[in-house]
């Protein structure tokens, strides 16, 4: 399964005059028809694809449980709380778990055994949380329709990517420029619907000049420019979660500042989910297009969007519950054609897209907790209106214990490397 992020292509935005009372009913009816049309168009042609994928997925109907003494996979099956497995699925998960030591041996760095802040290794080793490990491995297995060979290849690729990219470092040990921090927040609603408790928001209306943003923070920026921006960010942005400044390992960590910021946002959000809870083992994403004024997609944004989609698809499987596109201008339906034509999003993921040409989310998210601009309770007279940034929890998120061990190890390696260079 692919996890989707950003995307904007050629458009022209026409603002309608915020209507007279006499036309309000007609406008609301038109908007509702537009929402239905967009969602219908998005899902047209996908049902057969999803049905085909489902038909080919492994697993028959659950059979009666037998004793764990005769079926070792039954012990694994009992640890899974996010969903119900049949015996065949549990057997495959058991095989995948037992093969983890061999999988690690096939990676570029067998000592790197972390995914989403958890240690993925054999039972009995320090920091191995067996239920959470099993749930994470299940996501990789389910993403490939319970194909053990494909799941193994995906895991090897993910271990290698995490070892090289160091996403925990991006999330907890790097600072980013305020212009990037204003593009996204993380919210957590305790009373939210199932798997809508943790949400990452992408605020495209705050993207005032896409071309300049990606010249400064995208792949178009050279290393010297990125480092300079990171240093200036550390002086101007005191709200970051770490004392480090920017990509403080310089050229040793890959990716643009924009990419590292976006991956860091995802990693932080995952610290808030409970992989063993069927109601909170996935996150939602909301893309807000309010006040978007671009008339065409910037090439830098297009490249960054495709890169993020590919990274999420490979390395963050089965983690998206729903993706909302809100405040989408009536003329902006092209954006979903863009998502389909780039060819890196599965039909199953596209089915999770919901399109709204307004920002009223009170039917989906807790009204009492939402800002007024998203359909929440109006502020009392004289009280300042709450903004989405008032709900941002990203700076209070704590990393898992093993995640901290991984970062400490990375820091020790960097110190040793620097000492070797001095000597």
Curated annotation (Swiss-Prot):
Q: Which reaction does it catalyse?
A: a 1,2-diacyl-sn-glycero-3-phospho-(1D-myo-inositol)(in) = a 1,2-diacyl-sn-glycero-3-phospho-(1D-myo-inositol)(out)
Which sites bind heme? 204, 262, 287, 289, 323
Q: Where is the CRAL-TRIO domain?
A: 217-382
Which one of the record's GO molecular function terms can you name? phosphatidylinositol transfer activity
Cross-referenced SMART domains, in alphabetical order?
A: SEC14
Region of interest (Disordered), ranges = 1-76, 221-253
User: Per its Swiss-Prot or TrEMBL entry, what cofactor is needed?
Assistant: heme b
What subcellular compartments does it reside in? Cytoplasm; Endoplasmic reticulum membrane; Microsome membrane
Assigned keywords, A-Z: Cytoplasm, Endoplasmic reticulum, Heme, Iron, Lipid transport, Membrane, Metal-binding, Microsome, Transport
InterPro entries, per database record: CRAL-TRIO_dom, CRAL-TRIO_dom_sf, CRAL/TRIO_N_dom_sf, Sfh5
How does the record classify its membrane topology?
Peripheral membrane protein
The record's listing under Gene3D superfamilies reads: CRAL-TRIO lipid binding domain
Q: Which Pfam families match?
A: CRAL_TRIO (PF00650)
Q: Which GO terms describe its cellular component?
A: cortical endoplasmic reticulum; cytosol; endoplasmic reticulum membrane; plasma membrane
Q: Tell me which Gene Ontology terms the entry assigns under biological process.
A: Golgi to plasma membrane protein transport; regulation of exocytosis
Q: What does this protein do?
A: Non-classical phosphatidylinositol (PtdIns) transfer protein (PITP), which exhibits PtdIns-binding/transfer activity in the absence of detectable PtdCho-binding/transfer activity. Regulates PtdIns(4,5)P2 homeostasis at the plasma membrane. Heme-binding protein that may play a role in organic oxidant-induced stress responses.
Concerning its family, UniProt says: Belongs to the SFH5 family.
PANTHER family referenced in this protein's UniProt entry, alphabetically: PHOSPHATIDYLINOSITOL TRANSFER PROTEIN SFH5
The protein depicted here goes by the name Phosphatidylinositol transfer protein SFH5
Species source reads Lodderomyces elongisporus (strain ATCC 11503 / CBS 2605 / JCM 1781 / NBRC 1676 / NRRL YB-4239)
Question: Gene encoding this chain?
Answer: SFH5
